[in-house]
Every structure is written in structure tokens, then in C-alpha cells.
Amino acid sequence: NGDRYWFDTRPTLRKTAQDRATQVAEADVIEEIESRLKKLRREEPFAGLHVCPASSLDVPDEQAARLVILRTEDTHRANAGASAAITAAENILNNHGSKPRTYRNMLAFVAPDQEAMLSLRQAVRDFRAWRSIQDDKETLNLDAAQNKEVDANLHRCNDTVEARIKETYCWLLTPEIDCFVDMKTIQWDASRISGGTDSIVAKASRKMQQSETLITKWAPALLLMELNNVLWKDTDCIQIKKLWEYLCTYCYLPRLAKYSVLEDAIRTGLNSQEYFALAAGYTGDRYVELRYNQFVDCINTSDLLVKLDPARKQLLAEKSAPAVVVQPTQTAQGGEQPTLFNLPPDAPIDPTVILHQPPTAQPAAVPAQP
């Protein structure tokens, strides 16, 4: 005070905050982090966001892409073949409660970094300490200057916690299988999504789309490549419903965000001569309502994708089938009216109906010269 000094018998606010930070319970630290994470919102193209699930049952087993934010203790570190994060992710990937998970290719995970988690926990303790001082300002009998100091430190610590959460939850874990090496063993791709001001969910979405580990637009050529590699190697067709189930289930196949991505790829491919055909069904020897090289608006999950070679052969045979005439019937004027049909060679014919080849047209007589 001017040129005079004195000793205050009360500890400084900073010393009080440091002492209180050491007394913050671990459970309170975890609760603070998870409560902030649970404010995250789902973003496209994810159909669901699941923050710190207590068990695998908390993550639905459905045919749509979902992002799982792992718990604070499920940490990962660089170049780690095994970690608490991978163990937790594998449990959710393989199980849905007490049952095996079916649609495993629909999940991706974000995990915290092991080293960064230590800094985050300390930042949370500091924040909790300053908040407790603010809550006790009446008991501590703080003056105006001290209240201003508390508010400033609380605001600073809050910003630090928010920034540290984004820095800490930086590992994107996606399951994959190399079908040319081992069709059963899951490998985990771990990539960093740190940096930037976007949310954890937005960064994960952007990273997955850039790396094509989550596909929102699929070219028909890539769909045909997957069909030829695995899905219809030993058959000429595949049901669309079954194809979509395969894509949702097996981690060696591309991960599509939702069914409409597959539907759009099929529709684009059908409007071309290069990829595949579509049929409403198969009778055992021919495809029903076979179409290709045309725009198809309505695609049903019960429809079949058909290889081009058998599709072209059937369409060519149907096109070259001879016209046939059913036994003439009486018209309203008493005359006879033949009915023409273009039937495929193998079409079943009612034996009670008499079929005739249409008569060959005769050239008209040339009139005599006068």
C-alpha cells in the first residue's frame, strides 16, 4: 500500500486453487470429461453417435454407419499394436450385449491419446478447483478484486479443458480385413484427427471420407469390382438385399454410410452398357423383367443384380424369337382376327392352343402395261 507492505494471513487464491486441485476425486474428473463429450452432436453421414458407452449393448446393431467415442480410460498411443482402446473397440465390434454383433462393418471409433489424457485430467482438476472457489466465495469472504480474479481463471481453465478434449480425442480407429491375406483377422487402422477448431465428430467424418473408409458416393465401376472379386464369383446374380447385408457385415468390403449410397450406384450403373443388369426375379432358367442400359427409378431390395453376359444372351434370344399366331378368334363384325405374340424360345405354351407361324408376305402383283 504505497510504500508500506504487510503479510496477509490468508493464502493466495492461486495457492488455494492448487491445494484444491489435488483434492479433486478421480470420479469427478471422469464425470466432467464425459459430461462435456456428451454435448457432442451427431453429424452426417453418421446415423448415430455413441459417447462413452458403458457396454456393447449401448451401441445398436443396425445397417447404418455409427461413430463411437470411447471412455477416458480406453486410451491409445502411437505405433501401438495393442492398447486399452483397441481392446474396448474389439469388444463392441464383436458383441452386442450377450449376442454376436452382425453388422460389424458399420462402426468406427474415436479414442483418447494416452499421454494427452494426463494433461486433460490436470486441466479438469484446475477447472474444478477454481469453480469450487467461486462456489465458496461467500465463505471465503472474497473482495471485488478477488472475485474478478476467480472469474478470469475459471474462464481460462474452461477454455483449456475444451481445447485439451479436442487434442486428446485424436485417434480414429477403423476395423478392416485384407481378404487377400486373412479373411478372419481384424486389423485396426489408427489415424490422427487432431488439429483444427472443428468438433471431434466433424473431424472424424472428414477424415473417413477423405480416406474412403466411409463412402457417401460410390461409382458403379467400384461396385462391379467388388462383385467380381468376391460376391458373385460363383454365380451369375445376387439379390440386392443380400448384397447390402454383406456390405454392412464384412470388414473386407467397402464401408458405405447408408443404403441409398448403394442404391444410387446401382441406378447409375443400370443407365449404362458397361456394368450389370437388373431383374425382378429368376425362374430357374430365365430372368424376369430383365433390364439394363436404361434409367430405373424404382429399385427394390428383392431385385437381382445380374452379370452382363447372361443378361445379354437372354435379351438377344428374346429379341430374335419368332412371332407366333394364336388360332384366329371371331371379331365383333364376325370376321377373324389373329393375335400375335413374341415369345422367347423356352416360353411354356398351353398345348390346347394351336400356334401358327404367320404366313410369309407375298409380293404385290405388278400391274400389266397398257
Which functions belong to the PLM regions below?
Residues 1-370:
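Extended alpha-helical scaffold and adjacent linker segments that couple domains
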